[in-house]
């Protein structure tokens, strides 16, 4: 029984499950539906679509009409060609013989039309001139009849305008009169030639008259059809321009909608990276200074000492000689040229030489002799002794100061120490100890930095 139930269940067709839809597709469809529900259709789109449809209908209609007009023009042209060829074969040589007459007749007709137009222009100019002259005469007559009326500025302006119109009308009349004379002369010449040819070719003219009359008829008909084709072509161009403008407006609206969607998806612009927890204003930045730690202070002191120790010997000699030769005579008058550098107390070096001893180390030459500039032998000897003594003293001071370094950053210009042997020896020993301490301190600082980086 159980086996039969299992067999029947296995024989039953399995239910067909619908294919699993991708989650991304479902999300995209949901987003599209949400956007369609949230956003309303821009009313401008409907108006532009209506214009687009109307322009499309106009273009189709104008193209159809234009094609029909062109087809009709071609059919009339073919018909005229066929019939005229038949008449030429029927009439024969008379058509060629009478062509000069019919050409002269066409020229005379054209000259007649031009003469008629010139006559109308001349008549119009004559009427304008007559009216302007009547206006001036009436104005002058009213001014003379009224004794109480004064010749004021308004009356003068009115007369000036009337006079100007009279002058313009006279110029127009003169030009139209010249044109009328020229056209009349051409018309008379054309008519005279046509009469001469008519007398000369009377028989050929009568024989070929049906041909040229039919040709003139078809010519007028073809001219009308050509004008219709030109009008339809202009209307078609206008309809295409409206269609193009509607497409351009739709494209602009689409760009605006996409830009609005993009900006709404991005959201408002927030603060920059690292500015979330910053409550300090820009005005407080100059007042806030970082507190120096031990490593930074030691490194600054080491840099100051190393810079002062590596001053070249030539610079120290030159600075010592120039500073004491051109500076003030007393140590108290020497200005402090550079501000003092802050450093830890453990690295301060007490100076073994006081300022009062600079006078002993570098004695200043006494006042110049009264005979400076004289040419006596005594003055020459005195100047030579002074120069030789100054050179000896300068060389001795330079030799004694080669092993010393002055604190140029804290005390202004480089100052030489005393040349006495006990004090110079003590200063040299102290500088050696300081350089050893600085090197040890630098090694320790570098080791601490490496440990911090490793940690």
Curated annotation (Swiss-Prot):
Q: Name one GO biological process term.
A: intracellular signal transduction
* Family stated for the protein in its record: Belongs to the SH3BP5 family.
Q: What gene is this protein translated from?
A: SH3BP5
Q: Where is the composition biased (Basic and acidic residues)?
A: 1-12, 42-51, 380-396
Superkingdom of origin organism: Eukaryota
**Swiss-Prot/TrEMBL keywords:** Coiled coil, Cytoplasmic vesicle, Guanine-nucleotide releasing factor, Membrane, Mitochondrion, Phosphoprotein, SH3-binding
- What is this protein's record name? SH3 domain-binding protein 5
Q: Where is this region: Sufficient for interaction with RAB11A and for guanine nucleotide exchange activity?
A: 31-265
Q: Which PANTHER family match?
A: SH3 DOMAIN-BINDING PROTEIN 5
């Amino acid at each position: 029984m159980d086996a039969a139930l299992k067999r029947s269940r296995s024989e039953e067709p399995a239910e067909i499950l619908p294919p699993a839809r991708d989650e991304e597709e479902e999300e995209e469809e949901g987003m599209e539906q949400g956007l369609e529900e949230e956003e309303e259709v821009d009313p401008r789109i409907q108006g532009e679509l209506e214009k687009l449809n109307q322009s499309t209908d106009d273009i189709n209609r104008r193209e159809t009409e234009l094609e029909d007009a062109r087809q009709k023009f071609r059919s009339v042209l073919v018909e005229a060609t066929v019939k005229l060829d038949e008449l030429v074969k029927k009439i024969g040589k008379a058509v060629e013989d009478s062509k000069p007459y019919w050409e002269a007749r066409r020229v005379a007709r054209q000259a007649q039309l031009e003469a008629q137009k010139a006559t109308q222009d001349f008549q119009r100019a004559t009427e304008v001139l007559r009216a302007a002259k009547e206006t001036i005469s009436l104005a002058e007559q009213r001014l003379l009849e009224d004794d109480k009326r004064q010749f004021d500025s308004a009356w003068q302006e009115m007369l000036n305008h009337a006079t100007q119109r009279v002058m313009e009308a006279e110029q127009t009349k003169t030009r139209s009169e010249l044109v009328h004379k020229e056209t009349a002369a051409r018309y008379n010449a054309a008519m005279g030639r046509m009469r001469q040819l008519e007398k000369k070719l009377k028989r050929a003219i009568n024989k070929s008259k049906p041909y040229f009359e039919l040709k003139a008829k078809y010519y007028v008909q073809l001219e009308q059809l050509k004008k219709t084709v030109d009008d339809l072509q202009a209307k078609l161009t206008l309809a295409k321009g409206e269609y193009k403008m509607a497409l351009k407006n739709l494209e602009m609206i689409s760009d605006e909608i996409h830009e609005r969607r993009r900006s709404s998806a991005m959201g408002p612009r927030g603060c920059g990276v690292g500015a979330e927890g910053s409550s300090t204003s820009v005005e407080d930045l100059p007042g806030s200074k970082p507190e120096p730690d031990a490593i930074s202070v030691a490194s600054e002191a080491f840099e100051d000492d190393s810079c002062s120790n590596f001053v070249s010997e030539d610079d120290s000699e030159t600075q010592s000689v120039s500073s004491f030769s051109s500076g003030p005579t007393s140590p108290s008058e020497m200005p402090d040229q550079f501000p003092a550098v802050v450093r830890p107390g453990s690295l301060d070096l007490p100076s073994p030489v006081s300022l009062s001893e600079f006078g002993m180390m570098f004695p200043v030459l006494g006042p110049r002799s009264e005979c400076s500039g004289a040419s006596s032998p005594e003055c020459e000897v005195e100047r030579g002794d002074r120069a030789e003594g100054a050179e000896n003293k300068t060389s001795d001071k330079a030799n004694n100061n080669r092993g010393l370094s002055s604190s140029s950053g804290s005390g202004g210009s480089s100052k030489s120490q005393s040349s006495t042997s006990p004090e110079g020896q003590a200063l040299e020993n102290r500088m050696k100890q300081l350089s050893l301490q600085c090197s040890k301190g630098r090694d320790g600082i570098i080791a601490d930095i490496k440990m911090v980086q490793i940690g």
